[in-house]
From Swiss-Prot:
The organism of origin for this protein: Arabidopsis thaliana (Mouse-ear cress)
NCBIfam families named among the record's database cross-references: Glu-decarb-GAD
Catalytic activity: L-glutamate + H(+) = 4-aminobutanoate + CO2
Keyword Transmembrane: no
pH-related activity note: Optimum pH is 6.0.
Quaternary assembly: Homohexamer. Interacts with calmodulin with a 1:3 stoichiometry.
Protein name stated in the entry: Glutamate decarboxylase 1
SUPFAM superfamilies, alphabetized: PLP-dependent transferases
The encoding gene: GAD1
GO MF terms held by the record: calmodulin binding; glutamate decarboxylase activity; molecular adaptor activity; pyridoxal phosphate binding
Coiled coil: none
Length: 502
């Protein structure tokens, strides 16, 4: 006789996750559930939902690193439970951050003696780094104005209209007027002469970008420095420069070592760089470096001792993980100058492959420059039939995430697509992307043209009345719908026609 018994609902170990009750209901969206669920079910359900995310390696919109060596992944996981602010408890982690600051400062040609410690701090990204640099400029300007008995209520900062949104955040959050140099067609970075013309006695600094988000172009920091030196001599001001090198800070020293953009220029007082971009670390690490101690006002530095020892701190947040700092140190010593140079050269070569492939199609204008961040920004030569947004949308069907966007003022009428070439974007992928873009263009060519539809839907019939006068008769909504249906039926029928074996 076979004995059997019913399995209780609590005996979940015998159930497949997909045979359990946990996949029969929707996941909580607003309130925490009353009851627990097995760890296997929680993992499987969340993992399944995450499958709908894009593939990070094919996310060509992002500058952020999406691949690191397995050895570094191990270091990250082994330190993921360390809180960086516990400096007394994790002194080696603090030492690694200080080493990173020193290495990056020397990379940017900071005027340091051989054993002198650099002034800088690790952040969660360039946005926080820019906030800190901006606060230092504002406080220095305020202190100088107060000493001169002048008002301090109207600080401003001069940037190009192509700056990343974090500059707008800084201006709004910390009550600084943002004075933007407008762009123009064919010139998508800040014009140094226009920027200097905007400078007045209330300008806390001029921000230059080494690697525009829009097209990767390096702004002419040296020309800006030279023009600003002359203006400072004429006016008696001492307006400084901050370089936003979020993208280009780990590129220029290796690909363009002779380019003067950093602390070699006397008015450059601080530089930020994203470790999680071309510093080759996963998201969550940035750096800001000051020229010397005098450029970071002491009153902005806090000293705390409730974690076991006196700790100076200058950050906008408090707790943060240590793993990204450790990963940055790994990359700096693992790759060295040789390794970073090889990576950046590979990125540039793959950028050239992609750019030349797009040029051969004769369908696109290349908006990006040869010298700059390794990316390709391009726009349609003829957008009367189809748009860059349609190309971006259709590329997702092949797995590619390629952003389309309009330029800032006064070039809003220009729309571009942008492909960022990262370390893990190989030549094979570049060639494959060109093939898929050509496929998309052929598919779009087969679609009813936007212009043709506009003409057909807005078409008007002309008829003669009894007095031989021409009377215009507009199509009804039903007629327009019939035209659309007829057009799509023809399109579908043509798509079904084949010649040979499918």
């Amino acid at each position: 006789m076979v004995l059997s018994h019913a399995v209780s609902e609590s005996d979940v170990s015998v159930h497949s996750t997909f045979a359990s009750r946990y996949v029969r209901t929707s996941l909580p969206r607003f309130k925490m559930p009353e009851n627990s669920i097995p760890k296997e079910a929680a993992y499987q359900i969340i993992n399944d939902e995450l499958m709908l995310d894009g593939n990070p390696r094919l996310n060509l919109a992002s500058f952020v690193t999406t691949w690191m060596e397995p050895e570094c992944d191990k270091l990250i996981m082994s330190s993921i439970n360390k809180n960086y602010v516990d400096m007394d408890e994790y002194p080696v982690t603090t030492e690694l951050q200080n080493r990173c600051v020193n290495m990056i400062a020397h990379l940017f040609n900071a005027p340091l003696e051989e054993a002198e410690t650099a002034v800088g701090v690790g952040t969660v990204g360039s946005s926080e780094a820019i906030m800190l640099a901006g606060l230092a400029f504002k406080r220095k300007w305020q202190n100088k104005r107060k000493a001169e008995g002048k008002p301090v209520d109207k600080p401003n900062i001069v940037t190009g209209a192509n700056v990343q949104v974090c500059w707008e955040k800084f201006a709004r959050y910390f009550e600084v007027e943002l004075k933007e140099v407008k762009l123009s067609e064919g010139y998508y970075v800040m014009d140094p002469q226009q920027a200097v013309d905007m400078v007045d006695e209330n300008t806390i600094c001029v921000a230059a970008i080494l690697g525009s988000t829009l097209n990767g172009e390096f702004e002419d920091v040296k020309l800006l420095n030279d023009l600003l030196v002359e203006k400072n001599k004429e006016t008696g001001w001492d307006t400084p420069i901050h370089v936003d090198a979020a993208s280009g800070g780990f590129i220029a020293p290796f690909l363009y070592p002779e380019l003067e953009w950093d602390f070699r220029l006397p008015l450059v007082k601080s530089i930020n760089v994203s470790g999680h971009k071309y510093g080759l670390v996963y998201a969550g690490i940035g750096w800001v470096i000051w020229r010397n101690k005098e450029d970071l006002p002491e009153e902005l530095i806090f000293h705390i001792n409730y974690l076991g020892a006196d700790q100076p701190t200058f950050t906008l947040n408090f707790s943060k993980g240590s793993s990204q700092v450790i990963a940055q140190y790994y990359q700096l010593i693992r790759l060295g100058h040789e390794g970073y140079r090889n990576v950046m050269e590979n990125c540039r070569e793959n950028m050239i492959v992609l750019r030349e492939g797009l040029e051969k199609t004769e369908r696109f204008n290349i908006v990006s420059k040869d010298e700059g961040v390794p990316l390709v920004a391009f726009s349609l030569k003829d957008s009367s039939c189809h748009t860059e947004f349609e190309i971006s949308d259709m590329l997702r069907r092949y797995g590619w995430i390629v952003p389309a966007y309009t330029m800032p003022p006064n070039a809003q009428h220009i729309t571009v697509l942008r492909v960022v070439i990262r370390e893990d974007f190989s030549r094979t992928l570049a060639e494959r992307l060109v093939i898929d873009i050509e496929k998309v263009m052929r598919e779009l060519d087969e679609l009813p043209s936007r212009v043709i539809h506009k003409i057909s839907l807005g078409q008007e019939k002309s008829e003669s009345n009894s007095d031989n006068l021409m009377v215009t008769v507009k199509k009804s909504d039903i007629d327009k719908q019939r035209d659309i249906i007829t057009g799509w039926k023809k399109f579908v029928a043509d798509r079904k026609k084949t010649s040979g074996i499918c």
